[in-house]
Each structure stands twice: as C-alpha cells, then as structure tokens.
C-alpha cells in the first residue's frame, strides 16, 4: 500500500514549504516518492490528514493543527467495513498526532532542531502562501495598521499583530501620517492569499549609525515587527535582508 495523504494536508505542506519550512519541504519530498508506505513511515500509520483546533481569542481565532492518521489493520478479517475504501477516514478508526510525533514517523527525515519544529508548527497553521511587499504611501500604512484588514486567525492567543495598540482607526491614521509624510519611512507588509495582513514592519532607509565618534555607518533598520503567526517574523526579516 502506498502512502496516502489528504488534499488538505498536501495543501498545508505545500504552502508551509513555500513559506520557508524545511520540514514541510522534506515531508513533501517523501510523499511524492510514490513508494510503499512502510518504506517511509514507522509503524502501521497511513491515511494522514489534519484537523483544526480553534480557540476564540477576542477578534480572532487561534488555530492549532493536529495531525490525524489511521493505524488499524485494514486487512484483518474482523475489521469493520473491511472492504469499504472510506473506512480509514472514519473518525473511530483514526488517532490524533501532535506535530512532533507526526514528524518522527518519517523514517528518512530528521533529526530537526527545535526552531525548525517550531517554524513548521507555525507555518502549517496558515494554509496560504505569504507575500511580502515594500510600500511607502500613507494609504499603504493605514491598510497595514487597521485591524479590519488583519487575518482572522493566528497561531497563538498572544498575536502581536492583533494585540497592537495601533490597530484602531484614529491611531492607525496618526501613525500612517507620521511615517509616510514626516519620517519618510517605508513599511513591509505580509499578506496571505486573501490579502489579509499577517505581518508588518517599519523600514528606515539610509540612517546613520556611529561605530565610533569618527566612524559613521550608513544602514537600514527594521523596526516594530508585528505578526499573526510566528514564522512570518522570520519571513519579514529575510525579505528585509534581501531587499
């Protein structure tokens, strides 16, 4: 029997890999091998999927992804619905797996560092490609700051973006006016496929730092990074370094 993965899990893995998760990229490579499941997975697990654990957090929902799989002996003569191809997907035939356990089931992968696992857990919770662009107009600042434009979900209840004190219209307008019209700053804005804001950061270009009294250094500075998902912070930093 070949490794069987649901369309939702494939989608989440694909987007997580596009968003920089090394683990998601590695798992996708294993999934695409099209080999018997026992060559890839430890134990008797197969028919992998995901489910979302939702927690209300005020104006947004915290989403935590739990992996699910079937580990029943589908060929056993006493297995209910033995000849039903949908049987592996019935809730009573499935078990929940934490992300770390799911990763460890892959024979040919790992070990991974804790920060790689944390990145994977965060990235897998957003089923979307993240796009980051640099803007400089007052309207761009306003859109990035207004709470109504934020993603409705986060990977944690303490989302720095959703808890920003500048998310209200009056404060957002004042901040946008200051940064765009007086300070001359720019803003990196991260959005999902639905154009929801999932992160932002102020960019100060061509500032002068002093290495010593007589040694000025021209530099750019990334400031005030806010995100709905932890991995987005790393994407913003990477984008800033490459810009």
Q: Which stretches of residues belong to each language-model region?
A:
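Non-catalytic substrate-recognition and accessory regions of acyl/acetyltransferase enzymes
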Residues: 1-243
């Amino acid at each position: 029997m070949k490794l069987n993965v649901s369309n939702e899990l494939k989608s989440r893995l694909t987007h997580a890999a596009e968003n920089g998760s090394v683990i998601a990229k590695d798992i996708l490579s294993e999934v695409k091998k099209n080999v018997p499941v026992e060559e890839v997975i430890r134990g008797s697990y197969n028919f992998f999927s995901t489910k979302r654990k939702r927690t209300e957090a005020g104006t947004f929902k915290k989403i935590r992804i739990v992996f699910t799989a079937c580990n029943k002996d589908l060929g056993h003569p006493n297995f209910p619905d033995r000849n039903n191809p949908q049987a592996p997907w019935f809730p009573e035939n499935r078990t929940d797996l934490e992300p770390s356990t799911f990763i460890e089931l892959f024979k040919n992968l790992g070990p991974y560092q804790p920060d790689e696992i944390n990145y994977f857990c965060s990235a897998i919770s957003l089923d979307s490609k993240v796009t980051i662009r640099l803007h400089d107009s007052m309207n761009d600042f306003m859109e990035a700051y207004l709470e109504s434009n934020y993603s409705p979900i986060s990977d944690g209840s303490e989302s720095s973006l959703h808890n920003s004190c500048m998310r209200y219209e009056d404060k957002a307008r004042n901040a946008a006016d200051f940064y765009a019209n007086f300070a001359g700053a720019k803003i990196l804005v991260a959005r999902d496929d639905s154009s929801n804001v999932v992160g932002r950061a102020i960019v100060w270009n061509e500032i002068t730092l002093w290495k010593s009294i007589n040694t000025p250094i021209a530099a750019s500075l990334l400031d005030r990074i806010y995100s709905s998902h932890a991995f987005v912070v790393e994407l913003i930093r990477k984008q800033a370094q490459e810009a």
